[in-house]
């Protein structure tokens, strides 16, 4: 069976293959002769990085999982300054992390082509917001390409390298959840000889302080260069192979569709049976090419702009039309919603209203049927996996802390601790935010902490932050230093499951693994000690009693306590055992001992445990049990017994 990673490296120009959008981006980078790739994983961009990790050594590409997006951007940037083609990929909020360097570098430019892939998440399927990268690019005056198909996702990367080098400026490839994760036909192009031979490429950095040092005297003239360069891109995009006009030349109405919205518009027009509309397909939402706009607007009386999220194209078109004195009725966000992702339904409804047509489908009737289905189908909220070590950590923490404890948390699987029965997540904002929020609360609630001590005598802390291992290295370190330096009074629990689990089991500095072989492992507890934390301990969350006792000690210490809860991600570990042909333990309920107290369900909440309403007993689904033994530790009646031995 052929692996996708083999297909991505196929030396078969003209071959038609099926690829994920993110996999196609990697193929495009290889066809573009990439030399360096660096990224921090983040959904929906993660498969780009994982695919590159799988092929990099064979293709002669230096590839790394960086500690965060800022570091990844700077790594790729410096490779570009040394003359190599380089790429980084991140989710949309990852660009916020890289923003400081990103905005400064916009004035400096690049040498080798530099492509910044940013995967937006309209509808927030796995993100905390749905910010539009096109708006950020417009603010920064950085050009944006946006694919409408998997084929374009591949082809645009090579094109981006070329125009980046031509004009000496980085280029953003903006994708979305759908364009990242859709599959489609891709016709493979030619691979460069260096990629086929797997030869590492090395560059040459030529010193030029006036360009590369960002003191005001050097930077001041570059703003003008930035503005002049974006206009060169605008001119370039008039002839871009990813922009075109289709439909009858004598049409009176037109639709502008950037990126993936083009695919929805084409489907919507087919649904509506409309063929007398002119369509401007835009693969370059910023800057919009004015020459192409002039051609498109000829003979039109009304125009609709169909785009996801912010009116980035709409605003550019309206400003251009106003400045040109063009008297054409232009619609956009008055008909197309500004929130959530584009769908065929949304495109159909907007275009139908624009054209004064009835929709071919009764969507209201579908909505009513959907509501009825929702009433029948049991809800399936997300849950921590069976045997997830975080469940045990949360259970022990909640038991050890005062009832009034506050739990700032972070971005990762463990955010699911917000749900019952664990309820040990009170705030999340961004990667690394847990420690900063915990510190701020300790300052704001210092009097409350003293009062709590007097009332309960239960610990010197009421604030316990939780943060994952990868997140700790991502942006937790500065916040920890700040908390220690400013004598905060918090407990920080680092949930170390020995992998970057939520985005697909990628390595991080705490694992010591890299795509090219062993790296140097950095132990979280040693970092905390070196920073001067007042209490540092490491626990195995599969030992709930030990974890509980350690939390009690940590909560008694005045100052910053750091507890590292270390145990491999259960999902990752089970995968290892399956591949090795080994089995894991399984537990079952001894019905003679079970009293039906429901502590295992109402306080612990493992999804492998369910309630038998007839027998009024707890039961374990053997197909879901992964044998951590947490249930046996929390049951006060010893009703859970191991029925199969194994490793975990």
Swiss-Prot record:
The reaction(s) this protein catalyses: indole-3-pyruvate + 2 oxidized [2Fe-2S]-[ferredoxin] + CoA = (indol-3-yl)acetyl-CoA + 2 reduced [2Fe-2S]-[ferredoxin] + CO2 + H(+)
Residues engaged in binding [4Fe-4S] cluster 2: 606, 625, 628, 631
The protein, known as: Indolepyruvate oxidoreductase subunit IorA
PANTHER family on file: 2-HYDROXYACYL-COA LYASE (PTHR43710), INDOLEPYRUVATE OXIDOREDUCTASE SUBUNIT IORA (PTHR43710:SF7)
GO MF, one example: thiamine pyrophosphate binding
Function: Catalyzes the ferredoxin-dependent oxidative decarboxylation of arylpyruvates.
Binding-site residues for [4Fe-4S] cluster 1, renumbered to this chain: 594, 597, 600, 635
E.C. code: 1.2.7.8
């Amino acid at each position: 069976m052929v692996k996708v990673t083999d297909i991505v490296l196929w030396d078969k120009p003209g071959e038609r293959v099926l690829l994920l959008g993110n996999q196609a981006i990697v193929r495009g980078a290889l066809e573009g002769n990439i030399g360096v790739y660096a990224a921090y994983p983040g959904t929906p961009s993660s498969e780009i990085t994982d695919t590159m990790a799988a092929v990099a050594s064979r293709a002669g590409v230096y590839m790394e999982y960086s500690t965060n997006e800022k570091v990844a951007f700077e790594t790729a940037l410096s490779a570009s300054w040394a003359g190599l083609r380089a790429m980084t990929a991140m989710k949309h909020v990852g660009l916020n992390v890289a923003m400081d360097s990103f905005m400064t570098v916009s004035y400096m430019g690049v040498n080798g082509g530099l492509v910044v892939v940013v995967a937006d998440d309209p509808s927030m399927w796995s993100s905390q917001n749905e910010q539009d990268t096109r708006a950020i690019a417009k603010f920064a005056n950085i050009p944006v390409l946006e694919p409408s198909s998997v084929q374009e996702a591949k082809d645009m990367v090579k094109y981006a390298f070329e125009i980046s080098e031509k004009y000496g400026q980085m280029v953003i490839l903006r994708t979305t959840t759908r364009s990242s994760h859709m599959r489609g036909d891709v016709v493979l192009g030619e691979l460069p000889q260096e990629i086929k031979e797997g030869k590492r490429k090395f560059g040459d950095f030529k010193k030029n302080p006036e360009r590369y040092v960002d003191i005001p005297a050097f930077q001041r003239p570059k703003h003008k260069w930035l503005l002049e360069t974006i206009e060169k891109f605008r001119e370039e995009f008039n002839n871009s192979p990813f922009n075109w006009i289709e439909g009858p030349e004598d049409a009176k109405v037109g639709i502008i569709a950037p990126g993936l919205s083009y695919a929805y518009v084409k489907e919507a027009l087919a649904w509506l049976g409309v063929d007398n509309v002119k369509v401007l397909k835009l693969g370059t939402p910023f800057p919009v090419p004015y020459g192409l706009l002039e051609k498109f607007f000829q003979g039109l009386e009304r125009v609709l702009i169909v785009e996801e999220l912010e009116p980035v194209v709409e605003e550019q078109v309206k400003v251009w039309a106003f400045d040109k004195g063009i008297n054409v009725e232009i619609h956009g966000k008055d008909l197309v919603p500004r929130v959530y992702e584009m769908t065929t339904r949304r495109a159909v409804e907007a275009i139908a209203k624009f054209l004064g047509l009835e929709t071919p489908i009764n969507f209201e009737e579908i909505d009513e049927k959907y509501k009825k289905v929702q009433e029948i189908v049991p809800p399936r909220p997300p849950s921590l996996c069976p045997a997830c070590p975080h469940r045990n950590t949360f259970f022990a923490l909640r038991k050890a802390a005062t009832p009034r404890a506050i739990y700032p948390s972070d971005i990762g699987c463990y955010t699911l601790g917000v749900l019952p029965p664990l309820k040990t997540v009170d705030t999340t904002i961004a990667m690394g935010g847990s420690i900063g929020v915990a510190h701020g609360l300790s300052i704001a609630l210092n009097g409350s902490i003293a009062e709590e001590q007097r009332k309960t005598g239960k610990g010197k802390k009421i604030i316990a932050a939780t943060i994952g291992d990868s997140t700790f290295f991502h942006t937790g370190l500065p916040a920890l230093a700040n908390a220690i330096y400013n004598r905060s009074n918090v407990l920080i629990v680092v949930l170390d499951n020995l992998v970057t689990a939520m985005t697909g089991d990628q390595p991080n500095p705490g694992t010591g693994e890299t795509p090219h072989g062993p790296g140097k492992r950095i132990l979280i507890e040693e970092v905390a000690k070196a920073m001067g934390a007042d209490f540092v301990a490491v626990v195995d969350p599969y030992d709930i009693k030990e974890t509980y006792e350690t939390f009690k000690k940590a909560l008694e210490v005045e100052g910053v306590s750091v507890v590292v809860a270390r145990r491999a991600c259960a999902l990752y570990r089970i995968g290892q055992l399956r591949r090795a042909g080994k089995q894991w333990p399984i537990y079952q309920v001894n019905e003679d001992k079970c009293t039906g107290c429901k502590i295992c369900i109402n306080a612990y909440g493992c999804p492998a445990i369910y309630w038998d309403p007839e027998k009024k007993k707890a039961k374990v689904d053997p197909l879901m049990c992964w044998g951590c033994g947490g249930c046996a530790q929390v049951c006060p009646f010893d009703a859970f017994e191991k029925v199969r031995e194994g490793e975990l």
